[in-house]
């Protein structure tokens, strides 16, 4: 029994590390520099964008920030995490942050920092021998409570969950996690929106248009 408790504690620690060692209130004021100077590519930027166009099935995708996975097509600004192969469309007026050291996610804020959007991925297949997906989801939700957040609404399906509530600092939040395969491995991608209550309508629009349609090619 003690071994199981220790294992569960270690897994929760791993989850918290994947989320990041900063809370969201810090993220919305820290590390928000825009890295528009692309690092040297192994091929020319033009050839790289030709490859992106062919992969996404469109023409004229613009590279905004290679280092942090930011692209634009027409008026659509999106984050493409190449390490875990997922996408997130976000409002073009938002400022993007620096991709995490683990290369698993990024964060985005509006001009006055009243809305913060976080996305990150974790490997699930390494824990399959010890936990079912439902048990892992339960642990992820428990980790929110252990951070001091209050959950007021919860919906769990076979391959995803959605929770809503309030953070310890009094913000509202909406979080969605989905299990998917990336390069033959099972991963869980989590997107979390935190916002002040007085801009709830704008947040609901982001939930409807961006969060509920994330993960896959946004240009299809």
Region locations from a protein language model:
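Surface-exposed patches in mature extracellular/periplasmic domains of secreted proteins
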Residues: 151-154
């Amino acid at each position: 029994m003690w071994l199981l408790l220790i294992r569960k504690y270690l897994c929760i620690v791993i989850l918290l590390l994947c989320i990041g060692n900063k809370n969201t209130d810090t993220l919305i004021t820290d590390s928000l520099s825009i890295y528009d100077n692309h690092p040297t590519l192994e091929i020319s930027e033009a050839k790289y964008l030709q490859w992106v166009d062919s992969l996404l099935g469109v023409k004229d995708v613009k590279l905004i920030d290679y280092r942090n996975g930011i692209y634009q097509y027409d008026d659509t600004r999106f984050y493409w995490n190449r390490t875990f192969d997922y996408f997130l469309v976000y409002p073009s007026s938002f400022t993007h942050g620096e991709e995490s050291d683990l290369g698993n996610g990024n964060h985005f804020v509006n001009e006055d920092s009243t809305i913060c959007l976080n996305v990150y991925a974790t490997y699930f297949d390494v824990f399959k021998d010890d936990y079912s997906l439902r048990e892992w989801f339960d642990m992820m939700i428990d980790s929110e409570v252990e951070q001091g957040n209050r959950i007021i609404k919860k919906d769990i399906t076979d391959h995803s969950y959605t929770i809503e509530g309030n953070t310890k600092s009094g913000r509202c939040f909406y979080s969605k996690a989905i299990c998917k395969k990336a390069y033959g491995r099972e991963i869980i991608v989590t997107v979390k929106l935190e916002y002040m209550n007085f801009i709830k309508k704008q947040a609901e629009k982001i939930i409807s248009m961006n969060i509920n349609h994330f993960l896959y090619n946004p240009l299809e």
